[in-house]
Amino acid sequence: LEGVGLGIPMTVSTDPRNHFTHDPNATSIGAGAFSQWPETLGLAAIGDAALVQRFGDIARQEYRAVGIHEALSPQADLATEPRWGRINGTFGEDNLLAKSLVKAYIEGFQQGSDGIGPESVVTVVKHFAGAGPQKNGLDAHNPWGKEQVYPGGQFAYHLVPFEGAFEAKVGAVMPYYALPEGLTHEGQAIEEVGFGFNRQILTDLLRGHFKFDGVVLSDWGIVNDCNARCEQGLSQDEVTAGVSPWTVPFGM
């Protein structure tokens, strides 16, 4: 693409790679040769925004040194559902603490709160509009975890951490696979459509209310159909042959 008229460069992105969890199929890559820090949940336990910003700045330098210019992080989701398997990537359940640490994280990676600069690593805050309250703790990478609920009418509570991202002029926002179940916001019912396709969430709320004018980046495989293998799982022959379950398309 760099050779065409528009001169658009290829952008290399990555999930977090400065922590302990190694799950390259989904959420995080072990630090390896990169500096190793506590998971973001551990950083939240420390509760020091200056430290989180320092972490982001160090990780920024490491990313750029190897040609990575986009971070598929931070997670602004709140850990209000302890059964959900991704709470280690959050900043906990306190929405105000999460807001301050999300802001600091982005300022470290993007070098301040003035948006993208020549030495920035673009951050992608996720998963709008708050993926923490997965129904029964089941994850929306799978068709059986597609519902997202906000018990006690706490939808607005889950939006607060994203305010920190917008204050830091985050470069991109990623919605999740899930669909909102029985959700109302400011007296209006939200259509039960996946967040990545939901006009009320992306156009009215994100673009309209929050005035976000950056990139909306869909989560991976968002248009894949959920085929028979996706719904029923691998056959015994496939399991015996060592077929990875991550070859199964993500279900919507």
Task: Give residue ranges: language-model regions.
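Glycoside hydrolase catalytic-domain context in secreted enzymes
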Residues: L1-M252
